[in-house]
Amino acid sequence: MRHRARKTLTALAAAIGLAGIGVSALAQPTATGGPEVMPYAVEDFPHSLQVMSWNMCGPQRSSYHCEGTGTPEDKANVVTTQVAVNRVEAVLLQEVCEDDLTLLMTKLGPGWSKAFDNYQWLNNDGTRKNSRCGEDTGRADRIGTAIVVKGQIIDARTYPTTQPTAGQQTPFHCATASNWDVRLCTVHATRVGANPNNPTQDFRGQQFTEIKTIVDTFPKTVFGGDFNSRSPDDPKNPAPGVWPVGLYSTGPSTPGYQECDQNGSSRTGRPTHTTAATGTTPAIEAKIDYIFSNQTRNWCTVTPTSKSDHSIIIESVTISG
């Protein structure tokens, strides 16, 4: 049953923040990339879990090209707005600065938990250093990925995946949301060109296969993030073979995991990332962010925001008993 958007309740939910939210306000679209209309009221799915995935584009280091995407306060407010309006209860973050994560947790309050793991840079001599949020003379807090959950998390751990022999190292880590007994994992796959010694080297196929092997062991799971790959049925994908058989399903009751924005058997979806235009090239939009689950999908939203070059994805799933 579809519900009409209730503007008064939405405004109230946004105004009062997180404490005492007792309304099922439906999100309203805004010109600045605010919450997209939620297609169902959450009361329709009493055993649901709303999971948000977002590459925050949080670094202040120029190599990440995140200039002009807002302040740490702005980015934290994007998350808390989705919590208040779309009833998000778990968040999978990429490119989040550690101090900004602390700010977000303060805003969310004591009823929330987090798991964080940082990116590292692997030098040619085998030594490692933590990736900084700022330039070498700027912010020194670490940058990485995070899992944020309403309630307690248990068994937070990082799983080994194949990484470049030099250059940026990105973790794959998971944690169990105890309120739902579901395993949540955040992904930031290695982009092509991450190894400065071999810019054509591609680790995505190995990483996706390893991720599939790991999540296949979880009875109930939701995993998502920035996969740095177009979807396998996207005709513009130059390397669809990086997606292993049995990861991305071809529809209900087929092997693999249904993706949040998947429609029928087509393994595609709305764009989630925009590469800015230059003087010689136009802007490029592509779907490279995903949420997968082995639980029943209720609804999915994909919402662009001016606070990152990545859209916000939210999936509501019904958690099996």
Predicted features and spans:
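Structured beta-strand-rich core segments of catalytic domains in phosphoester-bond hydrolases
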Residues: 34, 41-43, 96-181, 189, ...
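Active-site beta-strand/loop signature of hydrolases that rely on acidic residues for catalysis
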Residues: 50-56, 79-105, 148, 175, ...
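Sequence contexts marking disulfide-bonded cysteines in secreted/extracellular proteins
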Residues: 56-58, 65-67, 98, 132-134, ...
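Metal-dependent phosphoester-hydrolase catalytic domains
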Residues: 34-36, 40, 215-222, 229-321
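N-terminal, active-site-proximal structural segment of metallo-dependent hydrolase catalytic domains
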Residues: 2-13, 19-108, 121-124, 321
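Active-site-proximal segments of metal-dependent phosphoesterases and phosphodiesterases across multiple
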Residues: 189-210, 231-249
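Soluble or luminal CAZymes and related metallo-dependent hydrolases
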Residues: 70-78, 96, 140, 164-170, ...
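Active-site-proximal beta-strand elements of phosphoester/diester hydrolases
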Residues: 46-65, 157-159, 174, 181-191
